[in-house]
Amino acid sequence: QCADANVVITPSDQFVLNEEAFQHNIEEGFRFVEHHQALLTIGITPTRPEPGYGYIQMGDAMEGATEVFRVKSFTEKPDRDFAKVFMESGEFLWNTGLIQANGHYLNSCFRQLFPDVMKRLDAVRPNFTLEDELEFVSENYPSYANLSIDRGVLERCDEVCVMHGNFGWADLGTWHAIYECRSRGEGDNVVVDSEVILDESHNNVIKLPKGRLGIVSGLDGYIVAEEDNVLLICKKGDSSALVRKYVN
């Protein structure tokens, strides 16, 4: 409703290690989008060749802004070899999925990319209230194209920039991130709500169904997880690629 607002869009499954640095980056981002007609996303320096994340290639630096660059390319979930090349090049950042923009530019992007969606919104906009939101979404959302905000908006807008964030970040949608973010117990294992007997096992992530007893012996750096009668046992670094290969 407020065209002059500056907006931040954030995924819900993210882990921020340094809240103060995160707040500083968001405030810097708001200052940038207030004076630039562009979408701004935030990227993080890769610490490993993670095939489960998206990557952003940095282009030219933006004048008058600290650690902000034009986006040269997006790559979604590359294989491990490409992820390693990206990390070693120094040109790529992990895509956090965080997006900032001013209301005017965001509105213009949506009108350019999704004219039918905006036409429906315009029809109800004068009297649209929060109480109407659920009804509107239930009636209209199923008919919209199945597009992620990355592919539907970020990769198609004319002006997209990336800020180099420094707040420490993990996407909790990967097993490796769960290992990094959860507290570790005996042998540096992360046992997630599971009953397990550990024998000479270290640096593993273990998640079993309630009522299932697991005995893990001689493993180092593995994922052992069961859900809906599917058992996954693999090295932590291979989990994202394997899940994508066999599940998707």
Regions found by a protein language model. Name each.
Residues 59-93, 127-131:
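A short, charged helix-loop
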Residues 41, 55, 73, 98-100, ...:
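Conserved hydrophobic/aromatic beta-strand scaffold that supports enzyme active sites
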Residues 90-103:
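Short loop-to-beta-strand entry elements in the cores of soluble alpha/beta enzymes
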Residues 104-248:
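Left-handed beta-helix
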Residues 40, 49-52, 67-71, 82-83, ...:
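Glycine-rich, flexible loop/turn motifs
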Residues 1-61, 101, 108, 112-113:
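Conserved beta-loop-beta/alpha segment of the NTase-like Rossmann-fold superfamily
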Residues 3-5, 12, 35-39, 51, ...:
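Short coil/turn connectors at secondary-structure junctions
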